[in-house]
């Protein structure tokens, strides 16, 4: 099985979303993320993700920055480890 066979189509950011890496867990369903547009934001874990999708430090997520407060965002998607590795290989995530 070649390397290309193991690749899959991943959810990519829409125009109002950006890739981010979780840096720190703040508590109260909030995390500190480093976004690929160069901004560090406080991201909120929405209620529909709480206790269903567990987010940890160094996870790759998609965030949607708030229109009215650019230093805050909502998490919209979390990538599995192998999906995050694929994004890094393809150059979408810079460490």
UniProtKB/Swiss-Prot annotation:
What SUPFAM superfamilies does this protein's entry cite?
Nucleic acid-binding proteins (SSF50249)
Q: Which GO terms describe its molecular function?
A: RNA binding; translation initiation factor activity
Q: Which PROSITE patterns match?
A: IF1A, S1_IF1_TYPE
Coiled-coil residue windows: none
Instruction: Please tell me whether the keyword Aminoacyl-tRNA synthetase is annotated for this protein.
Output: no
Q: Which residues form the S1-like domain?
A: 6-80
The protein's superkingdom reads: Archaea
- One Pfam family assigned to this protein is eIF-1a
Q: Does the keyword Protein biosynthesis apply?
A: yes
Per UniProt, which keywords does this protein have? Answer: Initiation factor, Protein biosynthesis
The family database entries (InterPro entries) matched by this protein are listed as: NA-bd_OB-fold, RNA-binding_domain_S1_IF1, TIF_eIF-1A, TIF_eIF-1A_CS
Role, per record: Seems to be required for maximal rate of protein biosynthesis. Enhances ribosome dissociation into subunits and stabilizes the binding of the initiator Met-tRNA(I) to 40 S ribosomal subunits.
Tell me its family: Belongs to the eIF-1A family.
Do you know which HAMAP family this protein is assigned to?
aIF_1A
Q: What is this protein called?
A: Translation initiation factor 1A
Q: Which organism is it from?
A: Haloarcula marismortui (strain ATCC 43049 / DSM 3752 / JCM 8966 / VKM B-1809)
